[in-house]
Amino acid sequence: MKRRILLVDDELAILLTLKAILEMHHFEVETASSAKEGAQRLTKATYDMVITDMRMETETAGYDVIRAAKAQPYEPAVAVLTAYPSLGSDWKTKGAHSLLVKPVNTDELLRQLEHLLSMHQLNKGKNGKNAPLPRPDKTAKAEKKAI
């Protein structure tokens, strides 16, 4: 069974590139081009993970997607994708589990997503809730391709 990801970003090139990469690696991917559309999709389908850009319609539109994801009974893992990593740890306090910085290379993206999905599933199994997840180690070799 393919794992389902909702990808939310207002940049069409990012959406299409990430969707193609993730589908080549056996993920089922749906996309949304705004926080509003992403929040609506979260209520109409079930996802294993949500990856959202932070800055879309507004500087903090990604937080709307995070809130919508956290409100779902199926508790998807949540990752923030941003070109502006100066968010500090605010993304954690808002409920996201991982921060992905654009441009991200393919190997690093896949490694982080696999780690996040594994840890999220393990934590859901232990306590039925989303617990903070440990960061993956940084020693994996990174492919030169960047998104």
Stretches with model-predicted labels:
Residues 119-147:
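CheY-like receiver
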Residues 12-30:
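Two-component/phosphorelay signaling modules centered on CheY-like receiver
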